[in-house]
Amino acid sequence: MLKPERPSNPIEKPSILILGTRGIPASHGGFETFAERLALFLAGRGWKVGVYCQKEVERVGERVTIDTWRGIELITIEVASRGPRATLEFDWQCVLDAARRPGVCLVLGYNGAVFLTWLRLMRRRIITNMDGIEWRRPKWGPAARAWFWLNEWIGAWLSQRLIADHPAIADHLATRRPRSAIATIAYGADPVTSAPEEPVRALGLEPGKYLVSIARIEPDNNILPIIEAFRRRDRGDMKLVVLGTLNDEIPYHRAVREAAGTTVIMPGAIYDQATVKALRYHARAYMHGHTVGGTNPSLVEALAAGNMVIAHDNRYNRWVAGEAAIYFNDTDSLSARIDEALADDALVARCSKAARARAREAFRWEDVLSAYEK
């Protein structure tokens, strides 16, 4: 897949530059975790790996600095902008720098694909993981949707190869490029076979006595319906834990907080992976309300932890979770699925077994990373 550019010197290592994330070591989302895993894997296989990292500063001093972490070059780009402008500044500066360095350019996401024009003019090999169909998300206004739609087209045509993380995304990309230019490679997760109880108890929870949701607090992730369905009736000593950053300046976030009540625990975003793994492992079930996107990393990680999943019924989640999940379409059906999960131990056990089997079948890191290298 990566097909390294032929080194000018036979003893040189093949090279790859990874663009499109905030950087590694991972402390944010799925793309950062993936970039870290792929970088370590390829470095261990003899590749020269560079990963671009974003650093926000008040005033740009030294625009580009390079450090080494576990055999990987961390190429840090200073940006003085904030918000969306910071992302655009970072993406553009990454492209300018990458054009001067040898190696395949692996771009994660297409939100700044317009800048890839410069890499093509410099005759660089570009492979882009196209992520989800961002412009379809209802949270965006017309201008943002137009920007994402345009960049999706540009990214599809400027990249020599496209990677889809889900068959439905591959089908969508096939309306942009020939199938021969598209590879389908999912996301990976490590199996979780044990986890300490202390991180769970530190949040005032009892193992097996809570449901958990880990997602951005956004309408298309159904966070508010999940809370409303859970609180529709008395759940006894069962709790709901919702992980995600809340900003009370955002109306939807205020509505979520107001709906939570005392039986919904909202600790914010937690980036400590040991704590997150423990919360998944000891949960009665994992709540997954995502309605758009491809293979969601959090859902894959729930399967690898052996979670029974209660998921929104759509083609993305159906392909990922399969028989490991029970599905809902609205608040009424979600409340009913919660009833089933709390009442039926045998159902939970069957779904948990199916979750681990599905994770082994389709989402092993070794298989995912090897597919990228090929």
Give the residues covered by each predicted segment.
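Aromatic "clamp/platform" in nucleotide-sugar-dependent glycosyltransferases that forms part
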Residues: T291
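Nucleotide-activated donor-binding/catalytic signature segment of Leloir-type glycosyltransferases, i.e.
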Residues: H253-A274
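Membrane-proximal helix-turn-helix segments that form the acceptor-binding/catalytic region
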Residues: A99, A144-L162, V256
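Conserved donor-binding/catalytic core segment of Leloir-type glycosyltransferases
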Residues: L17, G204-R232, V241
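Donor nucleotide-sugar binding/catalytic pocket of nucleotide-sugar-dependent glycosyltransferases
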Residues: I127-T128, E152-P196, L205-E206, S213, ...
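An aromatic- and histidine-rich active-site surface loop
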Residues: A86-D131, W135, G294
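Short hydrophobic beta-strand element within catalytic cores of glycosyltransferases
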Residues: A285, A304-A311
